[in-house]
Curated annotation (Swiss-Prot):
GO-annotated cellular components: viral nucleocapsid
Organism this protein belongs to: Jembrana disease virus
Annotated GO biological process: viral budding via host ESCRT complex; viral translational frameshifting
Cited InterPro entries: Gag_p24_C, Matrix_HIV/RSV_N, Primate_lentivir_Gag_pol-like, Retrov_capsid_C, Retrov_capsid_N, Znf_CCHC, Znf_CCHC_sf
Biased amino acid composition, Polar residues: 408-428
PROSITE patterns membership: ZF_CCHC
Protein name: Gag polyprotein
PANTHER family xrefs: ENDOGENOUS RETROVIRUS GROUP K MEMBER 24 GAG POLYPROTEIN-RELATED, IGE-BINDING PROTEIN
Superkingdom assignment: Viruses
Keyword Zinc applies: yes
């Protein structure tokens, strides 16, 4: 059913018999999105009633005790999915209660028909054994039904401290016994903090995939490579009994790749465990990285990716401050040249100059200028071009002058040394005053 028709049909279904509110396409999209968060694959585009029925059965089998989707949210998701199923199945419910009744009637009828089919098979093949963990769904097709929520939690706890180590590989071998190829990939992608480990595992899987494709050219009777890795197959096709050998092969590939990554991390110093010391020269650190990457079994693209990022992320604080503006994709020559002066006296003097330059900048960002020479970066009292009023030379003030030129003599104040004043007699213009 197309989205436009589905949206019109949803507007005719009320949420409850007592309310006039109707369902919208947003309610269905929300329910599908919540199912995807729980690891259940579903696509609303061109979905069929059988696919929605499988989704409802898988959602009901989940253990939501430790999940935030419980209570009202769980009930709302189930009710919305049942309304969607009833519309895709050709029913026209007026409200959600009628959709629940349609679903119950269909499940009872399917259960009875399934028992009849099982009875016929048992009568024909009385010694037939059921192949678990593949279980039979409501539409009769076998599929895997693992509790991926618990397995995601177990895997997160196993890789929380040390990433993919030997203990995590053992846990991975236990929890992937009942998983399909796509579910194993989802499990690996659930640890973003250990992205380097997962990328190494994926590179080793790609190498095995390439080797199998090469081998397949001379052995056409072997299983298809896409079937082994689960590529291009739906979840129901991956879970069929005919692909049991392919699931086991892919699981073995994943375990072998994870074990190689764990051995590379803990048996010898690998590139992920190499960090630059506080006083270690940057070229020596890069040399260690290159040596470790050369001994690693990975494609050249993966090695180059690790070298570009680890040379920046695992550098010490001083080198990282210089390398971050360049970025991981910068050429190695530029990185070596940028870190050449790190820790030297030239860099320290440069830091001091930048610190003093920041002091001479005003709060509003305007640079101070000297009123004597007009140059920025200092004020008049610190200017080196000011002249001494005593000797006339630049570079110091009169109070700091050490020149003997212009030194004051013992003459009375008001008379400078070097100046000679002649004493002249003054003739009075009037006779002296005589007092009787």
């Amino acid at each position: 059913m197309k989205l436009s028709k589905l949206e019109k049909a949803l507007k005719k279904v009320r949420v409850t018999p007592q309310r006039d509110d109707t369902y919208t396409i947003g309610n269905v999209l929300w329910a599908i999105r919540m199912c995807r968060l729980m690891g259940l694959d579903c696509c609303i585009d061109e979905a069929t009633a059988a696919e929605v029925a499988i989704l409802i059965g898988r959602f009901q089998s989940l253990d939501l005790q430790d999940s935030p989707l419980k209570g009202k949210d769980e009930k709302a998701i189930l009710t919305t999915l049942k309304v969607l199923w009833s519309l895709l199945a050709g029913h026209h419910p007026e409200n959600s209660d009628m959709a629940e009744k349609y679903w119950e009637a269909w499940t009872i009828r399917e259960r009875e028909s399934q028992k009849e089919e099982e009875g016929e098979i048992t009568s024909i093949y009385p010694q037939l054994r059921k192949n678990f963990p593949a279980v039979s769904t409501s539409d009769g097709s076998p599929r895997y039904d693992p509790d991926l929520t618990k397995q995601l939690k177990i895997w997160a706890d196993a890789t929380e401290k040390h990433g993919v180590d030997h203990h995590a590989v053992n846990i991975l071998g236990v929890i992937t016994a009942n998983l399909t190829q796509s579910e194993i990939r989802l499990l690996l992608q659930s640890t973003p903090q250990w992205r380097l480990d997962i990328q190494l595992i994926e590179s080793k899987l790609n190498a095995r995939e390439h080797a199998h494709r090469v081998w397949k050219e001379s052995h056409p009777e072997a299983p298809k490579t896409d079937e082994i890795i689960g590529k291009g197959l739906t979840a129901a096709e991956q879970a069929t009994l005919t692909t049991q050998e392919c699931r086991d092969t892919y699981r073995q590939w994943v375990l072998e790749a994870a074990l190689e990554v764990a051995q590379g991390k803990h048996d010898r110093p690998g590139p992920i465990n190499i960090h630059q010391g506080p006083k270690e020269p940057y070229p020596e650190f890069v040399n260690k990285l290159v040596t470790a990457l050369e001994g690693m079994a990975a494609p050249e693209t993966t090695k180059q990716y690790l070298l570009d990022h680890l040379s920046v992320d695992h550098a010490n604080e001083d080198c990282r401050a210089v390398l971050l503006p360049l970025g991981p994709s910068a050429p190695m020559e530029r990185k070596l040249e940028a870190c050449r002066a790190v820790g030297s006296s030239k860099q320290k003097m440069q830091f001091l100059a930048e610190a003093f330059a920041a002091i001479n900048v005003k709060g509003d960002g305007e640079v101070q200028r000297c009123y004597g020479c007009g140059k920025p970066g200092h004020i008049r009292r610190d200017c080196k071009n000011q002249k001494c009023f005593k000797c006339g030379k630049p570079g110091h003030l009169q109070r700091n002058c050490k020149s003997k030129n212009g030194r004051r003599s013992s003459a009375p104040s008001g008379q400078r040394s070097g100046y000679h004043q002649e004493k002249t007699s003054v003739t009075p213009s009037a006779p002296p005053l005589v007092l009787d």
